[in-house]
Amino acid sequence: MEKVPMTLRGEQMLRTELERLLKLRPQISEAIAEARELGDLKENAEYHAAREEQGICEAQIRDIEYKLSVAQVIDVTKMENTGKVIFGSTVTLIDVDTDEEKTYQIVGDDEADIKAGRISVSSPIARGLIGKMEGDEVAIQTPGGAKDFEIDRVEYI
């Protein structure tokens, strides 16, 4: 089984969601029991809704448990900063053409949130940055075409 990289923050988010779902599980079972008491199950909307909710909840629990079982949690704060872009590092880029500064943290696929500055390790930008060093100039293929960036800072935060 291949390990999937995940930040400490990503692991904590998954564990919090798993805890929430595990607390929800008995409530759904109660709703099913109450709906059963209402009689005929063929035309019992409450029963069918609760069963559907149970199926969704169980699927989410299995999904999170699987993700946690294959996760390789990487805590970059415990690593020596060598200036090299690695999984979990926070990279500040300067657009060579516009001098615009952008900062991204390279995270696992499930943790990515571009609005929060977290990009997936498998995104074109991250793939173009991994292994490069602070001060390097890189050409990255973006949806708008190739762009040149300078790696201004690499932080392990």
UniProtKB/Swiss-Prot annotation:
Pfam families: GreA_GreB, GreA_GreB_N. Gene3D superfamilies: Transcription elongation factor, GreA/GreB, C-terminal domain, Transcription elongation factor, GreA/GreB, N-terminal domain. GO terms for molecular function: DNA binding; RNA polymerase binding. Keywords: Coiled coil, DNA-binding, Transcription, Transcription regulation. SUPFAM superfamilies: FKBP-like (SSF54534), GreA transcript cleavage protein, N-terminal domain (SSF46557). GO terms for biological process: DNA-templated transcription elongation; regulation of DNA-templated transcription elongation. Residues 17-37 form a coiled coil. Belongs to the GreA/GreB family. HAMAP family: GreA_GreB (MF_00105). Necessary for efficient RNA polymerase transcription elongation past template-encoded arresting sites. The arresting sites in DNA have the property of trapping a certain fraction of elongating RNA polymerases that pass through, resulting in locked ternary complexes. Cleavage of the nascent transcript by cleavage factors such as GreA or GreB allows the resumption of elongation from the new 3'terminus. GreA releases sequences of 2 to 3 nucleotides. This is Transcription elongation factor GreA. The gene is greA.
